[in-house]
Design a protein with these regions (language model features):
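Positively charged, helix-rich recognition surfaces that bind polyanionic ligands
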Residues: 1-2, 12-23, 28-166
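Extended, low-complexity cationic-aromatic segments
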Residues: 6
Length: 166
């Protein structure tokens, strides 16, 4: 449904740089509001820089990825870094009375921590894939049975934290 003009704290026209805004979707995740813009503009002409040859990628739990040329990408362990904070927030949530305002606030706090962890993972993977695509012409990655690895209770947490499924 249409709601008309939406006031934003950021300068939206400066953000889209002269492109025509086709659609704006407003959503709420983890207690925060987000606006997603769909814009229409001419395709930019980009000169392709010469790329290196082929590379193979070996995914792992200890190091996120090891490239065939010897480059090692460390695993940031996003969940492990926020686990203590998450544990404390879950504990506080469990102590709140069901249906209360404070329980809702505690739920939002847990959701915000989870959203921050997911955002860190997504950001790292976006930066890594952009760098790989810009650096190498051919990329080969091993085919993993992630569902099977997650079934192993010893590996599950580490595999999910490294976000192999993405």
């Amino acid at each position: 449904p249409r709601i008309g003009r939406v006031h934003c704290m950021e300068n939206v026209t400066g953000r889209v740089r002269g492109a025509k805004v086709v659609r704006m979707t407003v959503s709420r995740r983890a207690g925060r509001w987000y606006a997603s813009l769909t814009v229409e503009r001419d395709a930019p002409t980009v000169k392709q820089a010469p790329k290196a040859g082929a590379v193979g990628i070996d995914l792992g739990v200890k190091t996120l990825a090891t490239l065939s040329d010897g480059t090692v990408i460390e695993n940031p362990r996003c969940l492990a870094a926020s686990e203590r904070r998450l544990k404390r927030a879950h504990k506080a949530l469990s102590r709140k009375t069901r249906g209360s305002k404070r329980r809702l606030k505690a739920r939002n706090k847990v959701a915000r921590i989870h959203a921050r962890i997911a955002s860190r993972r997504r950001d790292l993977l976006d930066k890594l894939t952009t760098w790989l695509a810009g650096t190498y012409s051919d990329i080969s990655i091993e085919d993993l049975n992630v569902a099977g690895m997650v079934r192993n209770h010893r590996l599950a947490k580490a595999v999910n934290d490294a976000s192999f499924a993405e």
